[in-house]
């Protein structure tokens, strides 16, 4: 960890008691700040508050009192998910108080090598692939952190100048990271997402590009080259641009040509040997290859990871095979694009379980994918009527309404036959029925296990 004095004697408010918020509060206290930690909920575990106060940190729980904006804080470290138009945050914005996220704090104290991944889809898989590739044969520590469920500031505090962190960075985190500068930045893709938070597509894109805002020509931006829109984004960086392309639209970085994956003019491996299924995972593999090669990773390590890595939980996760039916959990599919790419990964007939929080959009874009891949559609949640309408437009012969992703499992089994894929890929957020996509996916897996009498195979 870097020894910095920027926070000594400063008054800092930490908003949000999540994993990253609590770690940020403790780190700031160690750095000499006077810290107040606030959460609108009262923690279920009383030890959370007791531990904070035992460390000399003031805890304010049960609300976000506007009076905090009048207490002379020098800095706010905000949970990324709290919108800037929330009354308390808006009050600090109006006063001109600097507001950062824990991603920025972690960056400020990290002394080692930083690789960072963002994008609308594929972030977690790509982050994990890169971490495993760079770690293989590396004598120093290599960890992942960030939006992947591990506090960046905590890991940064523990690691030294020869170590590497691969972060997954969300648009929410990047908005509050004004000096963030990874040596290697990766943008997997950019679609319209989180418009309830960012308000406009352009705001969302601008937030994502925060990953390369401070890079120089000595740094690298690895970016998907398969859409003209994404190619244009590369003009907005000072970094050295390294493209990756499943469609071979560039051969300057990592790309697929024919049945093989290449790094520049060097063949790495056959695409069919990548264990992860679907074209989106070829793209994730290419992005990881580029970042790994720029980090000096040997081809043997890259091939070993790509031929053994079976996936990240809830991201097109293979669950089990029972009586000729294969079950997949893609609960992380919270937008239309993710379900599009999931369906493209299967040649077998798909019984699709889809639906969830209604964010106000329709699913007409899914119609051609339904038409080509979906044998039966089981819909649930707030958006079920819109999802059903898309299925009807596609000519899906069997459409069934269910309560949620759990009750849909026996319905899917009833409609299936040997050779079918039963896929949970909701194309919607989970918050209408579940606390998050992880819980939704876990409940789906439990329902599959109960139905089949088997345990998941990963």
From Swiss-Prot:
Keywords: ATP-binding, Cell cycle, Cell division, Cell shape, Cell wall biogenesis/degradation, Cytoplasm, Ligase, Nucleotide-binding, Peptidoglycan synthesis. Gene3D superfamilies: Mur ligase, C-terminal domain (3.90.190.20), Mur-like, catalytic domain (3.40.1190.10), NAD(P)-binding Rossmann-like Domain (3.40.50.720). SUPFAM superfamilies: MurCD N-terminal domain, MurD-like peptide ligases, catalytic domain, MurD-like peptide ligases, peptide-binding domain. It catalyses: UDP-N-acetyl-alpha-D-muramoyl-L-alanine + D-glutamate + ATP = UDP-N-acetyl-alpha-D-muramoyl-L-alanyl-D-glutamate + ADP + phosphate + H(+). It is an enzyme of class 6 (ligase). GO terms for molecular function: ATP binding; UDP-N-acetylmuramoylalanine-D-glutamate ligase activity. The keyword Nucleotide-binding applies. Disulfide bonds: none annotated. Cell wall formation. Catalyzes the addition of glutamate to the nucleotide precursor UDP-N-acetylmuramoyl-L-alanine (UMA). This is UDP-N-acetylmuramoylalanine--D-glutamate ligase. The gene is murD.
């Amino acid at each position: 960890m870097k020894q910095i004095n920027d926070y000594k004697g400063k008054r800092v408010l930490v908003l949000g008691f999540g994993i990253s918020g609590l770690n940020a509060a403790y780190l700031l206290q160690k750095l000499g700040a006077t810290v107040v930690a606030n959460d609108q909920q009262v923690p279920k575990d009383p030890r959370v508050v007791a531990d904070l106060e035992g460390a000399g940190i003031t805890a304010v729980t049960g609300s976000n009192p506007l009076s905090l904006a009048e207490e002379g804080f020098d800095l706010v470290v905000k949970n990324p998910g709290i919108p800037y138009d929330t009354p308390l945050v808006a009050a600090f914005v109006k006063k001109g108080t600097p507001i950062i996220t824990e991603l920025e704090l972690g960056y400020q104290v990290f002394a080692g090598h930083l690789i960072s991944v963002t994008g609308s889809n594929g972030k977690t898989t790509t982050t994990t692939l890169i971490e495993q590739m760079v770690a293989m044969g590396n004598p120093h520590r290599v960890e992942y952190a960030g939006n992947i469920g591990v506090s960046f500031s905590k890991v940064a505090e523990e690691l030294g100048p020869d170590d590497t962190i691969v972060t997954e960075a969300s648009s929410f985190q990047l908005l509050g990271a004004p000096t963030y500068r990874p040596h290697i930045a990766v943008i997997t893709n950019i679609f319209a997402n989180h418009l309830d938070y960012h308000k406009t597509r352009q705001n969302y894109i601008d937030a994502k590009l925060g990953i390369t805002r401070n890079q120089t020509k000595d740094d690298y931006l690895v970016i998907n080259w398969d859409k003209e829109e994404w190619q244009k984004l590369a003009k907005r960086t000072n970094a050295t641009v390294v493209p990756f392309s499943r469609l071979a639209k560039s051969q300057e970085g990592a790309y697929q040509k024919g049945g093989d994956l290449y790094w520049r003019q060097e063949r790495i491996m056959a695409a069919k040997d990548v264990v992860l299924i679907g074209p989106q995972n070829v793209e994730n593999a290419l992005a990881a290859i580029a970042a790994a090669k720029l980090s000096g990773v040997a081809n043997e390590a890259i091939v070993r990871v790509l031929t053994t890595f079976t996936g990240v939980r809830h991201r097109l996760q293979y669950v089990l095979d029972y009586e000729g039916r294969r079950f997949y959990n893609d609960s992380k599919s919270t937008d239309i694009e993710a379900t599009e790419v999931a369906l493209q990964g299967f040649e077998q007939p798909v019984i699709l379980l889809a639906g969830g929080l209604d964010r106000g959009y329709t699913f007409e874009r899914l119609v051609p994918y339904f038409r080509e891949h979906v044998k039966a559609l089981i819909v649930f949640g707030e958006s079920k009527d819109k999802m059903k309408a898309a299925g009807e437009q596609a000519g899906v012969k069997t459409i069934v309404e269910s309560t949620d992703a759990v009750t849909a499992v026996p319905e899917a089994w009833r409609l299936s036959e040997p050779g079918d894929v039963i896929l949970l890929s909701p194309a919607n957020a989970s918050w209408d029925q579940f606390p998050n996509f992880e819980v939704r996916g876990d409940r789906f897996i439990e329902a599959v296990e109960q139905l089949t009498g088997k345990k998941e195979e990963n």
